[in-house]
Regions:
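Conserved N-terminal phosphate-binding loop of PLP-dependent enzymes in the Aspartate aminotransferase
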Residues: 1-401
Length: 401
């Protein structure tokens, strides 16, 4: 057995099989490149589902982490620490909002948003106790907790995990009429991804997000934008909502917020909305810890200049131009996305998304398939144009054979 085969067999023997990774075992990484245990190099075109927007081993982020490691890493929220105020202030500023509630994982940010919206509904909007409803979109991905899978439409994510949490209404994504009809006086929030990532990088029809904004404002309903994957530079703007000129009531952030170093997530909203919480009503031992705040503070500082957003916009235009040329030739059926983020539907005759991903791996490019024959391309925003072009050449190579 090779070193790789050995490592995989031993991982499979001693871990739950809740993932089906490509047969590659990474040992080190830098920038947009990863190296496996046998010294082979791969271009990372997944970037940890956008957690690695700033690349592997980013100097600024590692320096910020190292400096904080030597000071203090954890206090719990039982005490104040000297990174917390800066982190909350700067992140709120970046979002154009007032208040931040830090958590760790994306799923926790979503859970926090659900609790916030319900409490806001009862205390501010005046919804009768226990009646609050949250509207979500079909084919959503918001995480893996029991409540979140309760409003998933993906059988794989849901099956055998019931009983399910009530209080959610599912409408087709992109359909304003359906959303309007689903709203009642007990609707407290609409929770949506401005671009559906796991569904295959689905961009809603133009006018949809502004329509959601208008409807939610009219009906006194919170518009919660899950920007955990789409936010923080990926689409060529700080937030995907900006492409449609939309400002939601609440941003959910995660993934890139931790710079690929530590898990950091946050709910960002107004003082009124997040003001529903009183001490003891919600929290997390690790949420807003000093190490997380130090790294995320650096992430926010990097985003403040706009350089990463601009890079994603420019390279993204190039990416979509090149991918667009592949459509119609028989191999690629459709390409969607914004900025450095693309969902590519490969003709099923050429193989499943998994088979295509494996062939790309053999050529030194790592991507992840999603439903059926779709692969998603989302390299770190620090990728060079030359490397991006090389990666695209490998994709063309796979599609030719
Ligand atoms: C990844 C993701 C989540 C969940 O984040 P975790 O950190 O994996 O819990 C939620 N929403 C969206 C849109 C995501 O892409």
């Amino acid at each position: 057995m090779s070193i790789t085969e050995n490592a995989i067999a031993s991982a499979e023997a001693h871990s739950a099989h809740n993932y089906h990774p490509l047969p590659v075992v990474i040992a080190t990484a830098e920038g947009a490149w990863m190296t496996d245990v046998e010294g082979r190099r791969y271009l990372d075109m997944l970037a940890g589902y956008s957690a690695l927007n700033f690349g592997h081993g980013n100097r600024r982020l590692l320096d910020a982490a190292r400096a904080q490691l030597d000071r203090v890493t954890l206090t719990s929220r039982a005490f104040h620490h000297d990174r917390f105020a800066d982190f909350c202030t700067r992140l709120a500023e970046l979002c154009g909002m007032e208040s931040v509630l830090p958590m760790n994982t994306g799923a926790e940010a979503v859970e926090t948003a659900v609790k916030t919206a319900r409490k806001w509904g009862y205390r501010v909007k005046g919804v009768p106790d226990g009646m609050a409803k949250i509207i979500v979109a079909a084919n959503n991905f918001h995480g893996r907790t029991t409540t979140i899978v309760s409003f998933s439409t993906d059988p794989e994510a849901r099956e055998d995990f019931g009983p399910y949490t009530p209080g959610f209404e599912i409408v087709p994504y992109g359909d304003l009429t359906a959303l309007r009809e689903a709203m009642t006086e007990n609707t407290v929030a609409v929770l949506m991804e401005p671009i559906q990532g796991e569904a295959g990088v689905l961009v809603p029809p133009p006018g949809y997000l502004p329509g959601v904004r208008e409807l939610t404002r009219e009906r006194d309903v919170l518009f919660i934008a899950d920007e955990i994957q789409s936010g923080l530079g990926r689409t060529g703007k700080t937030f995907a909502c900006e492409h449609e000129g939309v400002v939601p009531d609440m941003y959910l952030l995660g993934k890139a917020l931790g710079g690929g170093v530590v898990p950091v997530s946050a709910v960002v909203s107004s003082r009124e909305v997040l003001g529903v919480f009183r001490p003891g009503e919600h929290g997390s031992t690790f949420g807003g810890n000093p190490l997380a705040c130090a790294v995320a503070l650096e992430v926010v500082a990097m985003l403040r200049t706009g350089e990463f957003q601009q890079r994603a916009a420019e390279l993204g235009e190039h990416l979509h131009q090149e991918l667009g040329l592949l459509v119609g030739g028989g191999a690629v059926e459709e390409v969607r996305g914004r900025g450095l983020w693309a969902g590519v539907d490969i003709a099923p005759a050429l193989g499943t998304g998994r088979e295509i991903s494996k062939k790309l791996m053999e050529r030194g490019v790592l991507v992840k398939d999603t439903h059926g024959s779709t692969i998603r391309i989302a390299p770190p925003l620090v990728i060079s144009k030359e490397d991006l072009d090389w990666g695209l050449e490998q994709l063309r190579g796979v599609l030719r054979h």
